[in-house]
């Protein structure tokens, strides 16, 4: 998804809701998903004192600060994270998934065969998605029916198809009930569903902003929709002849520049990853992660940032973009990583520019803008969009009206 955002943004496609991030709760160190334990096994999370903190009066009081979202029948994911972080900062960690009680309660209505099948489901939940979590359970002698496991929020992710809604501002379908502001007309005056603000550039799945919770099945369906619209667009522009702004030789030089940088300088040092004339993508990745974790509302600060921290991280990202000119790749895998880290830096910058622009904390538990705590629905119940001007080399960030379609 990071490459999707970069490739579209660099040619001027309008982005939307890039401040939205997904910071899921996961089993610590192994990244095992918690959804099955909450929904299928009906497990509860406990603080370090063994208390079901989410059901406490203190939790209800804390959630009331974020009404109407915090007082809804179903607590939003970000606020569930907020409660977890609240316990940890109050010194009542770690947070444990009570697998022991959950399996014991389910076992009361099952025979031995059914219970064994249930325990197998617990393991398969990890083997289906994060094998490392199953390995971790083995390595730590963890049997979920006998020993609880620690959970905590992860590092932030940017995506538009799961529990996140960042991506491109795209056209809706050409139906009467769709507001004109939600339609993008092509040069022929027609509307093509899921076309970005750049004519002929389409996206789907993670690429579509303001449209989360599609997951795999919804993204697949959206992909089919987009494919049909692309065919329709191509037929309507049968005479169009695409022209590249660079020659094929220039494109090759650009794509393989990190390899040539490496070959020209690799003899200057005995350690392959330490060199006065280049930086490896792995080193740039750690540099970006350190900057964003410490200044961009990452794990190092319990997902908190403020105006000053955002100014600092923006300066750091500008330096990183400059230094990307000296990225070096010793093989094809590193060449891929070079381009990947460039895409990540641009994507992270768009994310933080949106947080910087939105003067509120829209998603407590996912991030906190401590200079603008709490939601401000009066002024910020809207989309935040941005556009990069490739010719001027400048960003423009602005509001976009939210039009309620479903009563």
Where are these regions (language model features)?
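Acidic/polar loop patches that form or flank catalytic/metal-binding clefts of enzymes
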Residues: 13-20, 233-246, 365-367
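Mobile, glycine/GP-rich and aromatic-enriched active-site lid/loop segments adjacent to catalytic centers
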Residues: 17-212, 294-407
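Long, amphipathic alpha-helical stalk/connector segments used for oligomerization, subunit docking
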Residues: 236-330
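A generic secondary-structure signal for well-formed alpha-helical elements
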Residues: 11-12, 49-50, 227-238, 359
């Amino acid at each position: 998804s990071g490459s999707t955002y970069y490739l579209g943004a660099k040619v001027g496609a309008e982005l939307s809701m890039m401040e939205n991030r997904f910071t899921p709760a996961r089993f610590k160190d192994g990244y095992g998903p918690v959804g099955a334990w909450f929904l299928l096994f009906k497990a509860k999370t406990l603080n370090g004192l063994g208390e079901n903190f989410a059901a406490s009066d203190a939790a209800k009081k804390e959630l009331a600060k974020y009404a109407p979202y915090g007082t809804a029948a179903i607590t939003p994911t970000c606020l569930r994270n907020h409660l977890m972080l609240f316990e940890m900062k109050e010194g009542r960690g770690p947070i444990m998934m009570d697998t022991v009680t959950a399996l014991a309660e389910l076992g009361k209505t099952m025979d031995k065969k059914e219970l064994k099948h249930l325990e197998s489901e617990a393991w398969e939940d990890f083997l289906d998605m994060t094998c490392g979590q199953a390995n971790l359970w083995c390595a730590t002698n963890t049997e979920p029916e006998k020993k609880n496991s620690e959970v905590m929020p992860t590092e932030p992710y940017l995506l538009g198809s799961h529990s996140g809604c960042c991506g491109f501002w795209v056209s809706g379908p050409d139906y009467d009930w769709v507001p004109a502001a939600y339609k993008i007309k092509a040069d022929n005056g027609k509307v093509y569903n899921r076309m970005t603000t750049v004519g002929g550039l389409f996206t789907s799945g993670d690429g579509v902003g303001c449209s989360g919770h599609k997951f795999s099945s919804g993204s697949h369906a959206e992909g089919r929709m987009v494919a049909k619209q692309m065919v329709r667009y191509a037929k309507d522009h049968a005479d169009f002849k695409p022209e590249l702004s660079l020659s094929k030789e220039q494109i090759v030089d650009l794509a393989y520049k990190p390899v040539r940088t490496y070959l020209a300088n690799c003899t200057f040092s005995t350690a392959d990853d330490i060199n006065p004339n280049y930086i490896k993508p792995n080193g740039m990745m750690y540099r970006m992660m350190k900057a964003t974790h410490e200044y961009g509302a990452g794990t190092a600060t319990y997902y908190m940032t403020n105006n000053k921290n955002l100014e600092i991280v923006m300066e750091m990202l500008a330096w990183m973009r400059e230094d990307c000119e000296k990225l070096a790749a010793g093989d094809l895998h590193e060449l891929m990583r070079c381009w990947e880290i460039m895409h990540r830096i641009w994507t992270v910058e768009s994310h933080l520019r949106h947080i910087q622009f939105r003067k509120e904390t829209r998603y407590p538990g996912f991030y906190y803008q401590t200079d603008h705590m709490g939601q401000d629905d009066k002024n910020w119940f809207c989309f935040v969009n941005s556009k990069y001007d490739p010719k001027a080399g400048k960003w423009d960030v602005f509001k976009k009206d939210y039009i309620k379609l479903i009563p």
